Amino acid sequence: MKTLTRIVAGAAVALSMTATAQADVDFSGKTIEWTIPFSETGGSAKWANFFAPLLSENLPGNPTVVVKFMPGAGSTKGANWFQEQQHTDGTVMFGSSGSTQFPYLLGDPRVRYEYSDWVPVMASGTGGVAYLNPEAAKKFNGTTNNMQGMTFIYGNQGATRLDLIPALAWKMLGLNVEHVMGIKGRGDGRKMFESGEATIDYQTSSSFLKGVQPLVDEGKAVPMMTWGALDANGQIVRDPTFPDVPTFKEVCEATFSCSTTGPEFKAWKAFFIAGFPSQKIAFLPAGTPQDVIDAYTKAFAAIRARSDFAEISAKRLGKYPMYVGDEAQSALNGAITVDASAKSFVTGWLQSEFGVSLN
């Protein structure tokens, strides 16, 4: 009986020490820098700027959360920088996107970062919408059968970035698209579209809602298709944020030159799954103490638990899930895993289409 008493007492002391450690995490008077490896005009910027003030409200001590931007090499510059960070006090964060995941998946030689070293504390899904200028949209009727002879111009962040999703989709649909390579973020692609330099574009959901929907309302842009969303069975269905817009799968099925049963679509879907359902992930650096990790996990969980969270996030980011703690780790695992045959197809296609060798 005395032994049992000692065990119970010891456990109580351990729990008390853990609670004390967590209580000691205090960001009062501190500034947390959340680095986004893109320009300030894209979807990742809107995502981080949405969460930053909410995170400030819910972290112990209510620190100032500042979103910083480090564009370059399609996000590889910022990710390589974050890999070298050794801050353990919770004042440095990083936000990745599909354009950070894809070069990692494809073995891009510029990648010097390792996702397994980082600590994911929150992840969220998103969608994507492709759109046309009004003149081209006159020939789009749910298929691209009447658009085969047209030439489009698209601002592309890089062949191995998230832009491979629209690039492969347009190729499968038989569209002749000229790619202007090396823009620093999708917001720059939207600016090209607005100025008339580009005639076709795509944006992630948050950027579309804020930057493109006004163009649609003014008659200056017309939605073409979304990439879709995944249902519980892993099937592509309409994006809940844009339920009236057909998916790429629907457009492909209706277009003579496109097939949803061959290796092209299998590869496209595999990279779509890696790039969108859990696209944006918030990380702390390697070596971050568990009590700091727990403080972030608790803060993001409190944000998600707000009674108005679904409403305010839908308006700014779209209707997509948010993952916290262990859920964020599972989301990361899905984002950095892709079938070997899909990877092989895409690397071969990148070589033939863009002259990019990853071997």
Give the label of every model feature segment.
Residues D24-I32, E57-V65, W81-V92, Y104-T199, ...:
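Hinge/capping helix and adjacent helix->loop/strand transition within the periplasmic-binding protein
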Residues I236, A301-G318, F345-V346:
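Periplasmic-binding protein-like
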Residues M1-G29, E353-N359:
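Short, low-complexity disordered leader/linker segments with a strong preference
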Residues V324-N359:
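Extracellular/periplasmic bilobal clamshell ligand-binding domains
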Residues F94-T100, L106, G185-R186, Y202-K210, ...:
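Beta->alpha turn/N-cap motifs
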